[in-house]
Regions:
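A glycine- and Lys/Arg-enriched "phosphate-lid" helix/loop adjacent to the NTP-binding pocket
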Residues: 40, 55-57, 109-160
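Hydrophobic/aromatic beta-strand patches that form the interior of the parallel beta-sheet core
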Residues: 8, 34, 115-117
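ATP-dependent small-molecule kinase phosphotransfer cores
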Residues: 32-109
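Pre-Walker A (Motif I) flank of P-loop NTPase domains
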Residues: 3-8, 88-90
């Protein structure tokens, strides 16, 4: 058996529903959902890495590719070691990573992509409203500032959009 994680990738703009769809898939036996945002939020905010990630996200900027992939890889390995994710019996559902070609290249030695799902949205104002609601309900600080949200859309268009 391959050491690569069998993976489904969820792509889409901020607020397109990647996390929602990932959570739904993750509840189905045989699937495990892992959001890159959850990896970042799992960092201790007072740690050097936590402060660094918060600094980028509070400005609506992407965390550098090599750091993002390394943090993801360490987090995924911990999930396997703790028995939360079983690569032999579960398909990994990823959202928020990889965001660009550089991250995809860095992740080639970890994942075997079986399916790619692109969630297309056309109304940016509805996505802003969705992100603002999420900020209130899920205490997501990265979704509280509309200027930051709009910078995230611009980053998505520049770095990720097909």
């Amino acid at each position: 058996m391959s050491d690569l994680f069998r993976t489904i990738l969820l792509f889409g703009a901020p607020g397109s529903g990647k996390g929602t769809q990932g959570k739904i898939l993750g509840q189905i036996p045989g699937f495990f959902h892992l959001s890159c945002g959850d990896v970042f939020r799992a960092l201790q905010p007072e740690s050097d890495l936590g402060r660094m990630v918060l600094e980028y996200s509070s400005r609506g900027q992407l965390v550098p590719d090599d750091l993002t992939v390394k943090l993801w890889q360490v987090h995924a390995s911990r999930l396997v070691d703790a028995g939360h994710f079983s690569p032999d019996g579960e398909i990994l559902v990823l959202d928020g990573i990889p965001r660009n070609v550089a991250q995809a290249e860095l992740m080639q030695s970890y994942i075997d992509v079986k399916q790619l799902v692109y969630l297309e949205t056309h109304d940016q104002e509805k996505m802003v409203a969705r992100l603002n609601r999420r900020a209130l309900h899920e205490n997501r600080l990265d979704d509280t500032n509309e200027a930051v949200i709009r910078r995230r859309f611009a980053e998505y268009e520049r770095e990720t959009a097909p």
